[in-house]
Amino acid sequence: MCSPEEAALLRLEEVFSATLARINSLVFQPLLEAGPEASDPWGRECLQLLQQLHSSSQQLWDVMEESLHSLRERLRRPEAVGLESLLLLQSADRVLQVHLEYIESYTCCVAVQAFQKAVKRRSEYWRGQRKALRQVLSGLSSEGSVGTALLQALRQPLAHHVQQYVLLLLSLGDTVGECHPTRELVIHAASLFGDLQSFMRQELDQATATQALWPTLSSRLRDVLCTPARRLLQDSQDVPVTVTPLRAERVLLFDDALVLLQGHNIHTFDLKLVWVEPGQDRCTFHLLTPEEGFSFCSKDPQGLVVWQWKVTQAVCQALRGKKDFPVLGAGLEPSEPPTCRCGAYTFHAEGRFCQATYEGEWYWGRPHGKGTLKWPDGRNHVGDFCQGLEHGFGIRLVPQASEDKFDCYKCHWWEGSMCGYGICEYSTSEVYKGYFQEGLRHGFGVLESAPQAPRPLRYTGHWERGQRSGYGVEEDSDRGERYIGMWQADQRHGPGVMVTQAGVCYQGTFQADKMVGPGILLSDDDSLYEGTFTRDLTLVGKGKVTFPNGFTLEGSFGSVSGRGLHTQGVLDTAALPPDPSSTCKRQLGQGVFPVESRWQGVYGAFRDFVRAGCPGDLREALLGFHVQSSRELRKSQEYLCCERTCPEDQAGRMEDLLEELLQHREPEALQQCLRKALSNSLHPLGKLLRTLMLTFQATYAGIGANKHLQGLAQEEVKQHAQELWAAYRGLLQVALQRKGQAPEEDEDAETRDLRVHSLVLPLVLPSFYSELFTLYLLLHEREDSLYSQGITHLSLFPDARLLEFLDVQKHLWPLKDLTLTTNQRYSLVRDKCFLSATECLQKMITTVDPREKLEVLERTYGEIEATVSRVLGREHKLPMDDLLPLLIYVVSRAQIQHLGAEIHLIRDMMDPLHTGGLYDFLLTALESCYEHIQKEDMRLHRLPSRWSSREPW
C-alpha cells in the first residue's frame, strides 16, 4: 500500500507540471517571439537572459515529468516498486540542481529588470493577457504593471511547489517510521528542499536589492557595474561606514567585488584578492588588496560587525566559486577565508610590475608561492615569489626587437633580482651558465657564443658586477687562441698566458687588453724569446732569442713595413745546447697564478652553502642545477617550461646525504662513501667535481693541450683534490652540528695531505686524467720517441739473445720454463721468459690511480724474483746489479707506450708518504730502465748477421 503522502506528491507534481506547460505557452513563447531592435544592446542581452530562463524552465519541466513517472509507477505497483525508486528520493540532489539553475536564471532577469524591458516592446498584448495570467496566479490584482505580474507568474508556482514538497516529505518521514530503510532518504530530501526555500528567499531579496540599486547610480556607473549575475550584498547608504584613506562617498559590497565610489572614480576590488584583518578596537577593521590597504570605520559597532561579517563571508563565497547554500555564511566550509589563495591580478601602480598580470598563489595581498607574471610587451616570468617579489627559482622570458627572438633566464632570484646560479639563453645565441648577484653576472660563470657566430668565443671564469674580472679562460676559436689569466672590467688585465692552435704560447703582463712590458714567447720548435713583443707576436725592443741548437741572439728587435723582422745585437754560436728544462720543458704560469686562488668562485659558492648550514632551499642557488638546453629556436611558451632535474627526488634529501656521511667515517667505508658521492652529479660533492672538471677542460683541452701548461695542470688537480676534501669536511661538520655532536678537530697539514693523497686523489684523478695525461705525453714526447725506438729494436731479439745482450747472468735465465716444439731451438724462442712479470707490468696502463700503478710495479718485481728463485731452486733476493737488466728485459717485452709520461705522472701524483720507500725505489729503478732504453746503443745496436745453429740453447 502507498501512503496518502505519496498520493499527494503525485497530485502536486501533476499540478506543477501542468502549470509549467501553461507558463511556457502563456509567458515564454510570447516573450521570446518579440525580438529586440538591432540597435538595442540591452534588449539583446535581455533576450539572452529570457532564453536562458526558458531553457532552465524546460529542464525543470523534464525532471518533473520524470518524477511524475516514478510516482505513477510506485502507485500502480506498490508491491514491486519500492519507495526508494522515487526520483525525488533517489536523485534528490539532481532535482535540487535544476531548481537552483532555474532560480539563478530567474534572479538574473529580476536584477536587470529583463521582464519589464521585454514587456515594453508588446505592452498592448500583455495588457490583454491579465485574465490569462490569473489562471496561473492566485491573488493577482487588476492593478500593477504587467512586468510585476510576469515576475509573480514565474516565481509563485515554484515557491508554492517547494513549500508543499517540504510539508509532504516531512509528513512522509513521520509515516514510514524510524526503522524504515528509506527514512534517511526522505529526511535528506526534506532537508534539501527546506534549505532551498531559504536559498530562494535570499536570492530574491538580493536580486530585488540589486535591481533597486541601479536607478540610484549614474548611467556611467551603471554601465560599468551592472551585470546580470552580480548581486548587491551591502550598501553603505543602508549601513553607514567610512573608508580611509580613500574617503569613499559610497561603498558597495557585491558578491564578486568590493566597489568604492569617489566622485567620478570607481575603485573595484576582486573579492578573491581581498584579505580581512580585524582591527585593534570594535570600531575598525582593515582590508588588504594587492596594491592598496583600507580601514573600515564606523561609529556604530553593530554596523561595523555587519560589514566585517558580510565582507568575510563574501570573500569565502567568491573563493569557493559558488554561492553558499542555503544562505550566505552557511555550510560546512570554514567561515574564515584562507590567507593563502590563488588568483589573477593586473597591477596598475607605477613600478616594475606596472601593467603586468600576475596569476598564481597569494599570501596577505602579495604574490607568494608559485605564479606567472605577464607584461603587455611580451615579457613573462614563471617561478617562485615571496612577499610580492621574485624569490626562488624562476624563468624570465624577454622578447627582443627581432621577430621570434627571446632572452630566456632560468635563474634563482632573491628579493626581486637574479641572485645565485642561473642559465641564460640570449637571442644572440649566446648562453651563460653561472652565478648572479643583484641581476648581474657575479662569481663563477661560463659565457659561450654559438659556433656559427661571427666571432665564436667561450669564457670560463670569474665575473664581477656583470664584467669579466679575476681569473678566467677565454677561447677565441676564430683566431685559434686561448687566454689564461687575469681580467679586470671585461678586459685582459694582469698576468696572463696565451696559447695558440699553432703551438706557440707566451706569457706576459696585460693592461686594458694590451700586452705591456717584457714577456716569454715559446714557439713550436722550442725556440725561446725573452723580451717585449706585440699581440701579433712581432718582436719589438730589447730581447733574447735562444734557438733549439743552443745559439743565442741578444739585442734590439723591430720590423719595417715590407722588409720583415730586423735586429741589432750579438749572435752567440759557441753556447752549449740549452738545458731542456729551460726551453722544451719550460712551464708557464706557475707562481704567477697561485693555485689556491684560481677558482675561488667555484670553491666559494660551496663554502657559502656550508656556512649557511646546507639548507635545501639554497642547494640549487649555490651549487647549480642541470637543465636540458637547446639552441634551436622555440616558441615563447616553450621557454617557460624548464625540464630541471629535481634534486630532492633524484639525489635524496640533504638530511639523508648528511646522515650518510656520519655513518661512513672509517677509512674504508669513507672511501666508498666518497666514491658514491663524487660519481653522483646531483650530490653536492659530485656537483662541485663536475664544475671543476668543466674548468679543467676549458683550460687544458683542445687548444690548451700544450706541454708548457703541464705544471699548471698537475698542481691544479692536486688543489682540486684538497678542496674536495675540505668540502667533505665542511659537510661533515654541518652533519655533526645538526645532530648536536661536537665538531671534529682541525687537521694539521700532514694529516690533511695524507688523507687527500690516500682517499680523494685516487677518486678524482680519473675525472681529469684524459687532459692531464695528454699534457704529460706532449711534455715527454721526445724521450718517449727515443724509448719507443729502443723497445722496437729490442723486440727483434729472441729471449736468449736479449738476455745475453742485456748482460743478464746465465744462471738466472729461466730456460727450463720454455717448452720447445719439434725443430725449435732455444735461441729462436721469443716472448716466453719472465712472461708472468711481463703480463703483470702491462697492467700498469689499465688504471689511472698512481698507488695502483705502483702496486703493479711491486707485483712485477715480485714476479721477477719468484721466477729467479724458481730457476735457482731457492729463495733469492736480487741485488740492484741483477735487478736492472732483468727489469729492462721485462720493460722491453711489456712494450708499454709512453712510459715516460706514465713514470712522471706517477711521481708527481704519488703519496709523499712513499718518498724514500719501496715504491720510490722501484719507480727509480723503472725510470733508470726507461732512460737506459733511450740510449743510442739500445736503439741502434745491430743484430749479428748470422746465428750459430749449434748453440746449445
From Swiss-Prot:
GO terms for biological process: endosomal transport. InterPro entries: Alsin_GEFs/MotNeuronReg (IPR051984), DBL_dom_sf (IPR035899), MORN (IPR003409), VPS9 (IPR003123), VPS9_dom_sf (IPR037191). Its main location: cytoplasm. Residues 796-942 form the VPS9 domain. Gene3D superfamilies: Dbl homology (DH) domain, Histone H3 K4-specific methyltransferase SET7/9 N-terminal domain, VPS9 domain. One of its GO terms (cellular component) is cytoplasm. It is found in: Cytoplasm. Keywords: Cytoplasm, GTPase activation, Repeat. PROSITE patterns: VPS9. It comes from the Eukaryota. One of its GO terms (molecular function) is guanyl-nucleotide exchange factor activity. MORN repeats lie at residues 358-380, 381-403, 409-431, 432-454, 459-481, 483-505, 506-528, 529-552. Acts as a guanine nucleotide exchange factor (GEF) for Rab5 GTPase. Regulates the ALS2-mediated endosome dynamics. Homodimer. Forms a heteromeric complex with ALS2. Interacts with ALS2 and RAB5A. This is ALS2 C-terminal-like protein. The gene is ALS2CL.
